[in-house]
Amino acid sequence: ATPLQNALVAAAVANGGKVMRPTLVDCVRSSDLSVISQTKPRVMSRAFSSDTAGKLTQMMEAVVTKENQNLAIDGVRVAAKTGTAQIGDGNTSIDGWVIGFAPADDPKIAVAVVVHNVDLYGSFAAGPIMKAMMQEALAE
């Protein structure tokens, strides 16, 4: 799966099971910065029930609170899932993955990060990048 596909997975959990159509442009502005057009969120499909999304959110929060405290952000409930994938070319390097969203109780951002060809697990290779992205997005 691509990073975009995995970001859509994280976003689907955050959105109660709804898979949203990804967009690249939030809005188009004129030279005076007034909004000319605004992208509207669109649901592509429902992947699973909101009940299942709630259970997945609890499990993903536990990944942060119990297993990977380095992904935690003070004052923010973070939901994440780390992953490590072998590259398969005969060497010992791996891809380190993490997907997640925050705040878990009122999601504003969903993220997927992959760091290719590293010697670290997902929480250590990709985790700090996800955390920094979330902190920056939530600070705005």
Label for each model-derived stretch:
Residues 1-43, 60-140:
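Active-site beta-strand/loop architecture of penicillin-binding DD-peptidases
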Residues 42-44, 50-51:
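A structural-propensity feature for long, helix-poor, extended segments
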Residues 2, 49-50:
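Helix N-cap and loop-to-helix transition residues
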